[in-house]
Amino acid sequence: RTRALAFDVLDENTILAGGASGGMFRSVDAGASWLMTTKPSQEHRISCLVQDKRSGKENIWYFGTGENRGSYLSDVSIYGNGIWKSIDGGLSWDSLPITTSNTPTILDGDFDFTFSIKTDISNDSLDVVYVATRGDIYRSDDGGGTWLKQLGGPNNSYYQYTDVDITSQGIVYATISSNCTDKGIWRSVDGQNWVNVTDSLFSPIYSRVVIGINPANENQVYFLAAETTGYGQHTDVFFGGETWTSLWKYEYISGDGTGNGGQWTDLSGSIPTNQSTSFDNFNAQGSYDLVVSVHPSDSNLVIIGGTNLWRSTDGFTSPNNTSIIGGYRVGSSEGDGNWGSYPDHHPDQHVILYLPSNDSVMINGNDGGIFKTQNVFKDTVEWESLNHGYNTTQLYTVAISSNANSKLLQGGFQDNGSRLTFSDNTDATWNMPFNGDGSYAGIADNEEDFYLTIQRGVMYKMKLDTNANRLAFQRMDPASCDSNKYMWMNPMEMDANNDNVMFWAEGNKLWRNNNLNNISYNSSHQKSDFGWEMFSDTLYPPSLKISALSSSLDPPNVLYVGTQNKRIYRVDNAHVGDPSVIQLPDILTAGSSYCTDIAINPLNADEIMIVYSNYSVYSLFHSTDGGQSWNKAAGNLEQNNSGSGNGPSCRDAEIIPLGDDTLYLVGTTVGLFATSKINGINTVWEQIGSATLGSTIVEYITYRQADGLLVVGTFGNGVYQTHLSSVDDILATGDNVDNFDLMLFPNPIIDRLSVVVNIDVNSDAKVVIYDQLGRSMGDAYFQRLYSGNNTIELNFSDYSSGIYFVSFVIDNKNFVQQIIIE
């Protein structure tokens, strides 16, 4: 998903683009290839972008972070972390400290969501930057060093929308949604004194309002408003929904632009509605996808974007000269096979740009990435993808074959379907046999039959060739289930030992299918009860929803069930008959704790780890007796032992036996973490793949015991894989042991720490400092130790106050000590 996109004014072959959770990228060959320019450890959640286009300032860029709709997982939203700046043409980035809270798990700053960022090219004496944040408009006169709020007030609502844009002469327009202080449409000639120019007939109810200034006549400005309930244009949208949208054109006449000084024209009646299908009607999806753009040289060509791109050749003065030029395939309707994408394009539009040297050429950022047309004027607009190495895909799930050494990978992609590859080549194509928001999947042992699901619990059995082309299909989600009880990503689990058995959730009910192999391919899009049986035990209360399913490998036939309200259940002999669904002893955590995963040791079904994804609840619980007792295991992933504070959201986990050791992995909203020893609240998790995965969201982890294949799905940077043979492949440490004496003082410290090590033989020590989230604070420090007492002096004068961990590795034995810097 791309909201941030811009040409470099110095060279239009240089394009900068930011993924909504994938980081900042730069292309110097017009999108033929891309290089990620934010470091793996830096902010990945990029929502808007701007270049300072003034002469001599062109190397200065800014991007904003965080989006309030779109970057969310299960019960968790993903916040940004302020404004970032580049002074070398976008090759490297640094945060503007006054805008960053460094608390990505807490909505505690105005700059946690940014919708738009603009610079004033008319001002040569000041470095003026405007930012539209959650409910507020800010201005900086010194390139982001300091900021002053221009419009807005207390931010009490999550969904508070704003936008800001500026003419080449420095006239600023801003919008603020109707649930905010200073709601309305605003105009300023100096960016400091503002007048509300909202027309008296404009809807009193509106959420997001986006701005489109006419480049050929900057006195003309379009405003496209979402959720104008009861006003503007009514449209029926897919899945039985409806919405209202308004489109207005403002023209400045005189004075301060209010009253007779500004002319308003309501163009809402030309917003496309009553099309042949609900997919064709205009749909902003509650403000998620919304853009309006006026062509640079033809003011009659105006494009509005929601799920689709709609082009008008008369400025939307009538509904007769409009056409779909991107998004969904024209005429799409609900049901598999009945809908798809416009050729070589993608739904859900966010940003539109025109090539400066040839404004027939347009590029567009949407949920599918970046796309380009050579001629936006053509009756049928043709597109090409620019996603060549632009690795910003968002995965909900990953599935692998159970067969050792198989290269088959399947991924459930946000708004990019269920995709597969049969190759481990990094340049391999992932083909899509099933469109939508890809969800859970199962792969039969023959690697020909696939069980694929998308959003809202739609499931198909498909026979695919090795290019993932459909050879046959059959819909198979139970006809007797109430789909209103399904989750957005509805849990499905294929039995770990038997590819003929599958488990399925329906709210508080559990289903099983013991006859997958005999589901016939009839090319039917109708639900089917074939092979499905419902367990008679239903979970209480009726409103409860199953959120996680996990089946055991050895011993087989144990099924664990997680829910949205912390409760965990176990089913023994889950593969036959009507076994009891037994609630396990209560876990001492908040009742709202949302279980996203239950990791099972593949060689011991009694060892499990529960993952709760909410912020401000304790995230990880470990059991070695099948859930009869529980121990906290999040350790340094939590700020406080209660789970409160600035700990990340934990997403998924794996327990991996490797020889005599066991590796524990946890995917979080700030990266992948590992440990080889669970030690309650003192468990030390170390960040893994800091130079590759970095702080990207790790949403899903899967492991194949047969050959050690580990696959990680990220929500923003695609899929990663490796093979494991020992714990040392991930952690260069063994068990914590007391084979040497070590003393640290003082603790807490101010700036210096003394470490005294007593050792029997000469050896080498590696010292690494980690922050509270297990992230390395720099390069390892190596010290030669000699038999007897050794003293190591560590300087922490450049460190911020807080909790840190000092790791000492001597002869592959590890000692970790928590320190506090005051």
How does the language model describe each region?
Residues 125, 385, 583, 587, ...:
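Acidic/proline-rich low-complexity IDRs
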Residues 724-739:
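Low-complexity, Pro/Thr/Ser/Gly/Ala-rich linker/spacer regions in secreted
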Residues 737-745, 749-822:
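C-terminal outer-membrane/trafficking sorting elements
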Residues 201, 733, 785:
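Short clusters of hydrophobic/aromatic residues that line enzyme substrate/ligand-binding pockets
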Residues 67, 730, 748:
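Active-site pre-Tyr helix/loop in NAD(P)-dependent dehydrogenases
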Residues 1-726:
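Beta-propeller blade termini and top-face loops
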